[in-house]
Amino acid sequence: TAHPFPCEISFAVLCDGALVATWVDHDLRLARMAMLSLDDALETGVTKAELRISRGSSMVAGSKWCHVMEAEPVALESKDDKIIFALWSRGIYCIDSSANELWRLPLLEEQGKSPPRSNEVGAISIVDDEVVVWSRGGKYQRISLADGKVLSDGSLGVDCDIESVFNDGENFLVSSNDGWAWEFSDGQITIARRLRGTIQDAIHDGSDWRIISWREDIMLRGGSNTRVDLGVQLVKQDETWMVLDNQG
């Protein structure tokens, strides 16, 4: 197996027919973002030992473009030829598929007393031509994808530490690190439920949210089934929903 860069991939999205991913090494305090063609075979890049020596100049092997990130990427999404991401303690950025910067914004501000790190970006959602940026503390901003103009802002209205957000159009499913999950629609919480762990994957099937949590498959408005292996991803095949687990 080829490894273009000797670090774990933290985020990956499809953009303009290619893969855009981020690689992070916390020990060496470095991060990369690169675009890889889906038509070409992966190449093997530098080793971890070589990276320690040339940590500032080593790039992702075989990439169309690769950039040294000035801080750790904490969220990544894409739509068409645009890539939207957030960097820890820095801001929110939008680039095109050639890595040209289109716009940038500062992080969301928390008013008054708030828990530590609550203004950090917890997730990014895309709804039509708008970007919804969620802070870990539950604030959100709606931003124009085209020019980065802030259109509106709001709040989930509960104490939380947002870990991920799934959406089906304007219907959002918010997952908190303490196991709470909320369906959020039309600016208000419609369902709140405490799960055994954070949400690994979720898809709205047209009537309800199908959720994979810690060794548990859940219908948000219904029951749940426990499982031995860890669920990773929901897959629909021949009108049947299945769960891909960590055993393949």
Residue ranges and their predicted role:
Residues 1, 11-12, 17-27, 82-86, ...:
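Short beta-strand elements that form the blades of beta-propeller/WD-repeat-like
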Residues 2-5, 40-69, 101-109, 151-155, ...:
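Aromatic (tryptophan-biased) beta-strands that constitute blades/sheets of beta-rich domains
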Residues 4-18, 62-63, 68-77, 112-125, ...:
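Repeated scaffold domains used in trafficking and secretory/extracellular systems
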Residues 6-56:
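A broadly used, surface-exposed interaction patch
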Residues 10, 29-30, 93-94, 103, ...:
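A short local loop/turn or secondary-structure capping micro-motif enriched for an aromatic residue
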Residues 27-43, 90-95, 137-143, 178-184, ...:
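Structural motif
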Residues 53-144:
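Solenoidal tandem-repeat scaffolds enriched in leucines and small polar residues
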Residues 119-123, 127-212:
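Eukaryotic tandem repeat interaction scaffolds
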